[in-house]
């Protein structure tokens, strides 16, 4: 269970006056999310949705308040194990030249010790099956559609079997059909694992029926957290899409104050609070889920050794390099082209610089000509050497950036 109690986040403001010395991005946010639950965090742009997600993950540390997981304070007590937390960004982080199966297998090798064990293949097959990627296992990432890439992003985080799965805009930018499919997948992932909580930050108010609860943020304040079916009634609108338009009718502080007065009654009515939840209430509240794949029991997840991770990164990089013909030719051009350029610029070699004689000719004109010739030889040699060095620096930088 995830609980937040009066969470506040303040950051330095842009001005020097007392009024704008600090900016309050989150203000007195309190909520409870029970296990096996799918939560949507919605709200207009800049309302604090992603900021709240970053506070939950620990990327940002709250200024005040408490965040609790299974009753323990995540700030002052034991934090979540890295394997217990999954964070899915909006855009794919998978490599285009790897296949779906290779991408997931590489993530498992980097984040678990399942590689070269009997548990590796069953765990990999389960992740492919539960995310609907079994038939796409041999396809390369670059040919996947937007919705399929979102599924792959979820699969990459499931390698550690996280109990807290946080999704940042994974349904944004998709067509209605793909958005509905990803939302149903999130609902499926929230079931089966006895402790799992799935949270999705989204702008869209479509497909809300597949969420167990909806949290509405406005100007850094929590102004509603309840079931989707009660959303329109609470805000006095006919359609969920009208919620955003009515937010400007009242200040954010009034919305938050109104919700704080009703929060306990809503939580008791809909069974969000563990203190009042009973097995009978839970069974009645939950509808039977169809097509739920039985949860695969993962062994205790531990991070692999640093050397193991390094070898996996090098192996993956070599595989990508061999498949990218343009990179192969680019590196060959750099490695072979540089010596050729050196040969072109110094085809006759760099002539040795003669030292200027200490003997001064009595003829001033001859002496000045000697000095000018010596300086010209120095300038030519210096320009050639510095130019070659600069070219080498540029080529090495390009190779390093491409490898990175």
List PLM regions with ranges.
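Topological signature of polytopic alpha-helical transporters
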Residues: 1-6, 11-22, 44, 66-69, ...
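Conserved ABC ATPase "signature" region
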Residues: 119-136
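Helix-to-loop junction immediately C-terminal to a conserved catalytic motif
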Residues: 57
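Q-loop/switch helix immediately C-terminal to the Walker
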Residues: 91, 96-113
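ABC ATPase C-loop
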Residues: 157-158
């Amino acid at each position: 269970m995830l609980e937040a109690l009066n969470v506040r986040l303040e950051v330095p403001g842009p001005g020097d006056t007392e009024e704008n010395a600090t900016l309050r991005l989150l203000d007195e946010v309190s909520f409870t999310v029970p296990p096996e639950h799918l939560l949507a965090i919605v709200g207009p742009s800049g309302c604090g949705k992603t900021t709240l997600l970053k506070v939950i993950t620990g990327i940002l540390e709250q200024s005040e308040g408490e965040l609790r997981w299974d009753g323990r304070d995540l700030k002052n007590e034991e934090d979540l194990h890295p394997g217990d937390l999954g964070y899915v960004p909006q855009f794919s982080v998978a490599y285009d030249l790897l296949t779906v199966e290779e991408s997931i297998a590489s993530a498992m090798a980097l984040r678990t010790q399942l590689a070269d064990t009997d548990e590796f293949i069953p765990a990999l097959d389960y992740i492919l099956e539960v995310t609907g990627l079994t038939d796409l296992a041999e396809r390369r990432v670059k040919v996947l559609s937007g919705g399929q890439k979102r599924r792959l992003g979820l699969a990459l985080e499931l390698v550690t079997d996280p109990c807290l799965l946080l999704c940042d805009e994974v349904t944004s930018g998709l067509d209605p059909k793909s958005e509905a499919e990803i939302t149903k997948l999130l609902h499926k992932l929230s079931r089966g694992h006895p402790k799992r909580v799935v949270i999705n930050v989204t702008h869209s108010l479509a497909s809300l029926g597949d969420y167990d609860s909806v949290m509405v943020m406005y100007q850094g304040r929590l102004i509603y957290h309840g079931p989707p079916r009660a959303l329109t009634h609470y805000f006095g609108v006919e359609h969920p899409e009208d919620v955003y338009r009515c937010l400007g009718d009242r200040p954010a502080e009034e919305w938050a104050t109104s919700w704080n007065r009703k929060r306990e009654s809503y939580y008791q009515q809909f069974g969000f609070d563990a203190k009042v939840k009973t097995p009978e209430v839970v069974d009645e509240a939950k509808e039977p889920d169809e097509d739920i794949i039985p949860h695969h029991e993962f062994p205790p997840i531990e991070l692999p050794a640093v050397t193991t991770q390094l070898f996996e990164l090098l192996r993956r990089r070599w595989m990508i390099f061999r498949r990218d013909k343009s990179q192969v030719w680019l590196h060959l051009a750099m490695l072979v082209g540089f010596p050729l350029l050196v040969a072109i610029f110094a085809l006759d070699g760099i002539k040795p610089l003669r030292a200027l004689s200490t003997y001064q000719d009595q003829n001033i004109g001859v002496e000045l000509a000697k000095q000018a010739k010596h300086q010209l030889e120095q300038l030519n040699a210096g320009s050639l050497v510095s130019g070659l060095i600069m070219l080498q620096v540029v080529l090495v930088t390009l190779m390093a950036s491409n490898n990175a």
